[in-house]
């Protein structure tokens, strides 16, 4: 049997992906309307979108698809990227950004030198009034981390299918035996663990997902049930 080989993932990339999770949402207001900016993971690996625009922001460089429409929804005035880019125009645009977005991104301005570091992509959704926009954003992992840590984003959660089950071994005790002792065991032999996880009343502890939980076993109709009551904290966690 060949060993399972997992691809190596950069630690910063893994951290950014984990913080993005199932998605993060940020509420804001613009042009007198309540709005919401949402970042979501890509459904599949995708390269940088054609026609996207690199922009310099306070948290780092961002690559945006459909940048004109996206940025226009983040403030009180429409944005155009056509024609000659003048400093006064971008200054006005930044002044009319939603205060929430301005604290996060301003100053926003064109970026002429594309970053050479690998980027991480995500989907962008904006809802404002009756308008809705879907776009893509790419950024380096450290820029995405700064983006997610520089405002009061709200993590999105996914409903877990009730039919989904997780199998975990129930360890009732532990002991060490030599090979000779194991070979000598016969059906019906009684083995007493040196370290017991449960007592004779069915009360004990279960290690699950790196945590320890107080547990109680019950038997009904020839079936064994296990009930977790609360998490047991280790002394160093206080």
Swiss-Prot record:
Query: What is the protein's membrane topology class?
Result: Peripheral membrane protein
**Which stretches of sequence are listed as region HrcQa-C?**
66-238
Question: Assembly and interactions?
Answer: Interacts with hrcQb.
Give the protein's function: Component of the type III secretion system, which is required for effector protein delivery, parasitism, and pathogenicity. Probably participates in the formation of a C-ring-like assembly along with hrcQb.
* Protein's gene: hrcQa
Record keywords, A-Z: Cell inner membrane, Cell membrane, Membrane, Virulence
GO cellular component terms, semicolon-separated: plasma membrane
Species of origin reads Pseudomonas savastanoi pv. phaseolicola
Q: Where in the cell is it found?
A: Cell inner membrane
Write down what this protein is called. Answer: Type III secretion protein hrcQa
Primary residence: membrane
Domain remark text: The HrcQa-C domain interacts with the hrcQb C-terminal domain.
